[in-house]
Amino acid sequence: RRAAGTVRDVGYDTNLDFELLAAMQPDLVLLYGISGENTIVTGKLRELGIPYIYVGDYVEESPLGKAEWLMLAAELCDRRDAGADTLRQIATRYEALRAQVDTTAARPRVMLNTPYRDTWFMPSSRSYMIRLIEDAGGEYVYTQNDSSSSVAVDAEEAYLLANDADVWLNVGACNTLGELTAQNPRFAAVPAVRNRRVWNNNRRQTPAGGSDFWESGVVRPDRVLADLIALLHDDGTADSCCCYYKRLE
């Protein structure tokens, strides 16, 4: 529908075209607010008599908890039973995959992300991504943060953490090892780079050019977990079987 032009662009954040939105007469508006309620938007929607719901999948720390938000779409589309059945299948496969590596002795250490203006943001050890890594039989290199958000780490400390990692994931816009080491020549000496164990979560692209990891991957943690198990334990199938991840060459 987007390609056919039947999905209208009404703006972003507080810059919404409320006149266009009102003319469309929506039954419901779905809102996404990382920093809490946007009272400018919600106040105007109430004034116009337009119902709204906040989608809060981003606050979920559990991969399966995040996937449960597919039930919102199922309810809105009058597909409750189909949604519940899909969610059960996802949960069953996720738990089966986790059980495969639950007792493995090898726990590869994992580094995440790349620097932004000389600052490295390291996720909380309670976060969604770290839960996935642990369920895949990996170990996060940064254990000093158990808050509810990422923390800034200076580039030198992050470089030392990267040197302690077996695998490096989610490297931003980098598509090759050359692009990664261009950010900092010292990255070439990091074990994960030398051993070609750097992976990015941008194998699948959306029609708009974004990473599908942050779209369909949100409600398919079983697929994400399968990717992570394959690449963390280097079973030889990851390059061909991964859905969301690709190895940097």
Residue positions per predicted region:
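Extracytoplasmic
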Residues: 5, 16, 105-107, 193-195
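Alpha-helical segments with a strong preference for the paired helices of cellulosomal dockerin domains
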Residues: 15-23, 43-47, 177-187
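C-terminal soluble interaction/assembly domains
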Residues: 142-143, 148-240, 244-249
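Flexible, glycine-rich surface segments
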Residues: 92, 97-182
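A short, structured surface patch at a secondary-structure boundary
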Residues: 1-24, 28-35
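Short, structured coil segments at secondary-structure junctions
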Residues: 48-49, 136-137, 194
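Short amphipathic alpha-helical segments and helix-helix/interface helices
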Residues: 18, 41-43, 73, 130, ...
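Extracytoplasmic substrate-binding proteins
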Residues: 6, 27-28, 37-119, 143, ...
